[in-house]
Design a protein with these regions (language model features):
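Catalytic Walker B motif of ABC-type/P-loop ATPase nucleotide-binding domains
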Residues: 92-96
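ABC ATPase NBD Q-loop/coupling interface
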Residues: 1-13, 153-155
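Conserved ABC ATPase signature
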Residues: 67-71
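Helical segment within the ABC ATPase nucleotide-binding domain
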Residues: 106-119
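Short, glycine/charged-rich "phosphate-handling" switch motifs in NTP-dependent
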Residues: 138, 150
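ABC ATPase C-loop
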Residues: 84-85
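ABC-type ATPase nucleotide-binding domains, specifically the catalytic core motifs of the NBD
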Residues: 6-8, 31-48, 56-61, 151, ...
Length: 170
């Protein structure tokens, strides 16, 4: 199904969550309000999921009543991911979750995404090779907007040109 021309709310209603590269949070709203804006169904199941998310991202619990604009870059990224994940979407599109984050924060975000991938399908766009190779099952190498290769990490590593040119492995 083609969804490019659909309004954002229609895409969300179809069970697709999106985490933009720029984090897309409301800086003037508290963490709690940012989460409430994202929630489509306020029911017991959503409340359980919210508890699960707050365990995945304990920093969000600490800053629950603080404006999103006061969060660090990593905390904003966690909030952005949490907002997309709270509605039990069938598909999460996550764009560059490690961009601009300190290595320790990248690790926390990566661990959280690893836990989430057991419960939902995730399409991850990521230039951080370590993060992508840890999280991913199936990989697409895109160069200048074109898919130049795809497969498992094992398959990609077997291709000497792919290793040298795209994976940064000598």
């Amino acid at each position: 199904e083609q969804i490019q021309a659909l309004p954002t709310y229609t895409i969300a209603q179809k069970g697709i969550g999106y985490v933009p590269e720029d984090q897309g949070i409301f800086a003037g709203l508290t963490v709690e309000e940012n989460m409430k804006v994202a929630i489509q169904k306020d029911n017991e199941e959503t409340n359980k999921r919210l508890d699960y998310i707050l365990n995945l991202f304990p920093d969000l619990k600490k800053f629950w009543k603080k404006p999103g604009g006061l969060l660090s870059g990593g905390q904003k990224q966690m909030l952005s991911i949490a907002r997309a994940y709270v509605n039990e979407n069938e598909l999460l599109l996550i764009d560059e979750p490690s961009k601009g984050l300190a290595p320790i924060v990248v690790e926390k975000v990566m661990e959280s995404i690893l836990q989430m991938k057991d419960q939902t399908t995730i399409v991850l766009v990521e230039q951080n090779f370590m993060m992508a190779s840890t999280i991913g099952d199936c990989f697409y190498i895109i160069d200048d907007g074109r898919t130049v290769s795809n497969g498992s990490m094992k398959q990609l590593k077997e291709d000497e040109e792919m290793k040298r040119k795209y994976l940064g492995i000598a």
